[in-house]
């Protein structure tokens, strides 16, 4: 057990460190879903996305919304305000948001490892700045990769980004050990990660879906809650 002296010294040091530089001071949001709880830590290095997400949660924006787009071995997506009262089979995910958030792509610091929380956005043809939706987000599940698969992912990234996005050795190890979706790296803002409930994400990404990737049986966010 730490001595009182060490504890006091630790408290003194951490009190002098700005919040945005201290991982332990990250905000944590819990999504209470019909499949279980998912706890998300928000990155202080992406303050625009962090603050926007916290504001949405405080407003109750996500309460009652569906995971309207689910792709097995890829990701689960929510944030469409029309999903709250959607009829069975209704196509979702195309609601027009009133605002967008400037991209905060911090690659390679943050990348699309399994459990990553990222902002959805419009395509490059109409959104070359890669600005994010202020509302819609996704949580990565992905898959585990071997070196040959990662080489193919890098070749795709080289072509798509004109060689601007390179997988790092550390990132490759994460994709081999934990999994994720490297083909999205450097293209979307990753602003948090799953710290508990990855088993819930796994369960959701396995559900049966229709031709529009909407789950046949609704998977709903009952309530989003700020824990810290």
PLM segments and residue spans:
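Sec-dependent N-terminal signal peptides
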Residues: 3-13
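Cyclophilin-like peptidyl-prolyl cis-trans isomerases
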Residues: 17-228
């Amino acid at each position: 057990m730490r001595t009182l002296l060490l504890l006091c010294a630790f408290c003194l040091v951490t009190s002098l460190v700005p919040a945005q530089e201290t991982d332990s001071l990250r905000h944590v949001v819990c999504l209470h879903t019909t499949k279980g709880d998912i706890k998300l830590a928000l990155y202080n290095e992406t303050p625009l996305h962090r603050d926007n997400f916290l504001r949405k949660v405080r407003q109750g924006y996500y309460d009652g919304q569906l995971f309207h787009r689910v792709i097995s071995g890829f990701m689960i997506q929510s944030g469409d305000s029309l999903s709250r009262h959607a009829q069975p089979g209704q196509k979702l995910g195309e609601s027009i948001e009133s605002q967008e958030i400037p991209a905060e792509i911090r690659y390679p610091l943050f990348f699309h490892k399994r459990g990553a929380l990222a902002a959805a956005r419009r395509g490059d043809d109409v959104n070359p700045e890669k600005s994010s939706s202020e509302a819609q987000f996704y949580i990565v599940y992905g898959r585990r990769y071997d070196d040959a698969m990662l080489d193919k992912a890098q070749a795709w990234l080289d072509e798509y980004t004109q060689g601007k996005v390179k997988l790092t050795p550390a990132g490759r190890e994460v994709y081999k050990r934990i999994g994720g979706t490297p083909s999205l790296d450097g293209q979307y803002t990753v602003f948090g990660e799953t710290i508990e409930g990855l088993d819930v994400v796994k369960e959701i990404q396995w559900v049966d879906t229709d031709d529009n990737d909407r789950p046949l049986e609704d998977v709903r966010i009952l309530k989003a809650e700020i824990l810290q």
